[in-house]
Amino acid sequence: MTTQAIHSVLAMMNITAEQAAGNTLTLSAPATAGAGFMSELNSSIKQINGMQIEARRKAEKFELGVPGIALNDVMVDMQKASLALHLGIQVNNKLINAYQEVMNMAV
């Protein structure tokens, strides 16, 4: 599978995921494939980190007794952050496996 084919499959997967989430996304190829992938990867890592930070802040506010912060909201945010982290780890593992498979291909 060529790099262009891989990027095309990844773009289609992103479109499907966005449509499933209810967002509309237009099909466009990134200007440079490497930069597009790196920016998506960095964006995802920052988003996961942001979810974890927000969950911790909400938990701290709940512990301090700030009005308007309910336990169920704290628990839901903590679970969302946990699921996002586990998803990120699984995606990382799949990318490493794909990289190793490509590197082991005979030329």
UniProtKB/Swiss-Prot annotation:
<dbReference type="GO" id="GO:0071973">
    <property type="term" value="P:bacterial-type flagellum-dependent cell motility"/>
</dbReference>
<dbReference type="GO" id="GO:0003774">
    <property type="term" value="F:cytoskeletal motor activity"/>
</dbReference>
<dbReference type="GO" id="GO:0009425">
    <property type="term" value="C:bacterial-type flagellum basal body"/>
</dbReference>
<dbReference type="InterPro" id="IPR001624">
    <property type="entry name" value="FliE"/>
</dbReference>
<protein>
    <recommendedName>
        <fullName>Flagellar hook-basal body complex protein FliE</fullName>
    </recommendedName>
</protein>
<dbReference type="Pfam" id="PF02049">
    <property type="entry name" value="FliE"/>
</dbReference>
<keyword id="KW-0975">Bacterial flagellum</keyword>
<comment type="similarity">
    <text>Belongs to the FliE family.</text>
</comment>
<dbReference type="GO" id="GO:0005198">
    <property type="term" value="F:structural molecule activity"/>
</dbReference>
